[in-house]
Every structure is written in C-alpha cells, then in structure tokens.
Swiss-Prot record:
Pathway: Cofactor biosynthesis; pyrroloquinoline quinone biosynthesis. Gene3D superfamilies: Heme oxygenase-like. It catalyses: 6-(2-amino-2-carboxyethyl)-7,8-dioxo-1,2,3,4,7,8-hexahydroquinoline-2,4-dicarboxylate + 3 O2 = pyrroloquinoline quinone + 2 H2O2 + 2 H2O + H(+). Belongs to the PqqC family. Keywords: Oxidoreductase, PQQ biosynthesis. Pfam families: TENA_THI-4 (PF03070). It comes from Pseudomonas putida (strain W619). GO terms for molecular function: pyrroloquinoline-quinone synthase activity. This is Pyrroloquinoline-quinone synthase. The lineage of its organism: Bacteria, Pseudomonadati, Pseudomonadota, Gammaproteobacteria, Pseudomonadales. GO terms for biological process: pyrroloquinoline quinone biosynthetic process; sulfur compound metabolic process.
Length: 251
C-alpha cells in the first residue's frame, strides 16, 4: 500500500485551522464568562488559575530556544519571552496579568503565591512545559499554534466583560488588548515554521495530534475550574473545605 500523499501547504493550514472547533472558547466555562453568567468567584478563580499558565509560558519558550540551533529562529522567538517577562526596566504580560488580578479583586501576593492554583490546572500546564523541554524545537514551536484562535478569544473578553461585569476595573483589560497584536504576529512565525517543517503526510498527522494535545491542555484546565467553581466540588471537597492540595513541588 502506498503512503498517503502529503497535504499541500494550503490544505495543511486548513486542517490546522479546523482544529479551532475544539478551542477552549467553546468550553461552557468560557461561554458563561463572555455571556455574562459567571459569578465573581468564577472569574477570580479563572484569573488566579490562568496566572499559573502565564508564568510558565516563558519557561516553555525558553525550552524551545534552548533546543533550537537556528539563530534566526531564536532571534525572532525570543520576543515571546520579552512579551511575557518584560524587557529590562519594562513590564511584560505577567505584570499585566497581575493588574488584571487586581482589577477583579485579587491580591497580587496571593496570585504570586499560587495558592489558588488547582491541581488539575497545575498538571495540565506542567505537562505542556515538559513537552516543550523534551520535544524537538519544531514540534514544541508548532504546539503554540492554538494562537491561531487566540485573537477571537481576547476580543470576546474585551467586547463582553465591560458590559457584563461593571465591577471589574477597566485598567485590567490591558493584557487582552496587548495580546491581540502579539498573537497575530506570533501566529505568522509559528505557521511559517510548521508549514515548512511538516512535509510528509505522517509528519502532518503527528502535528495535528500535537495541536490537539495543546487543545486538550487548555480544555482540561477549564474542566478543573468547572469542578471547583461551578459545581463546587474542588479537590477533597468530601473531606475538607480547606485548600490542602500541594502548591508546587520543585523537581
């Protein structure tokens, strides 16, 4: 039996974009947020748990840089680190997220402590960082292509949150506004790497699975938040109301 022919670049890009059907913008938790049905606790829980994702993104990108021998790719990819960590003397996305936390009524020190991060969220994010460390730099870079769908999710928050949640300080929306442009720029670079690297049908199918893996991570994070903040069944809820779960173990 002959091997299946590779998809053309246009067909491959179309297949990648079709994965947007599984993006977490469609998760009931996110739908509730942009439809105005989320409670203050649910929004605060989302902001607190997503902070763990935010602080780990630079570590993911640093792993890609460490594994990449191509200087030109590194020169462009390093901008992602600066976007989140900030350049010397400048704030980055992490500080912008802390301001979002303040805007929804969370203390920055509590966010930094990560005491509100649910185990399910921590496991999902850690799996993503570990994948980036162990995979080839091309596969790790391509896993970032959920950014294909990110501008829509940022815009949905900017469009709906001020209307539905007047108690949120509008200054907190800076992160979403900034990421609109950054995500579009990052998509161009990531898509170029992906379309150039995956040239056989088997490699293209593997890349689609990698993208699904990343979508699974984002969806699983919201599943954990749904259990805790919608169904009121956080970890160990049958035996205690205390947050007894681990707060991160250095390995």
């Amino acid at each position: 039996m002959s091997e299946a022919l590779p998809l053309s670049p246009a067909e491959f890009e179309q297949a990648l974009r079709a994965k947007g059907a599984y993006y977490h913008i469609h998760h009931p938790y996110h739908v509730a947020m942009y439809e105005g049905r989320a409670t203050r606790e649910q929004i605060q829980g989302w902001v607190a748990n997503r902070f763990y994702y935010q602080v780990n993104i630079p570590m993911k990108d640093a792993a890609i840089l460490a594994n990449c021998p191509d200087r030109e790719v590194r020169r462009e990819w390093i901008q992602r680190l600066l976007d989140h960590d900030g350049a010397p003397g400048e704030d980055g996305g992490i500080e912008a997220w802390l301001r979002l936390g303040q805007a929804v009524g969370l203390d920055p020190d509590q966010l930094r402590s990560q005491e509100l991060v649910l185990p399910g969220v921590r496991f999902a994010v850690d799996a993503y960082v570990n994948f980036a460390r162990r995979a080839s730099w091309q596969e790790a870079a391509s896993s970032s292509l959920t950014e294909l769908f990110a501008p829509q999710i940022h815009q949905s928050r900017l469009d709906s949150w001020p209307q539905h949640y007047p108690w949120i300080d509008p200054a907190g929306y800076e992160y979403f506004r900034t990421r609109l442009g950054q995500a579009r720029r990052d998509v161009e670079h990531g898509l170029t790497i992906t379309l150039q690297h995956y040239t056989t049908r088997a490699a293209q199918e593997r890349m689609l699975e990698i993208l699904q893996f990343k979508l699974d991570i984002l969806w699983s994070m919201l599943d954990a938040m749904s259990m805790a903040y919608e169904l009121h069944r956080p970890p160990y809820h049958t035996v205690t109301q205390q947050r007894v779960w681990h707060k991160g173990i250095a390995l």
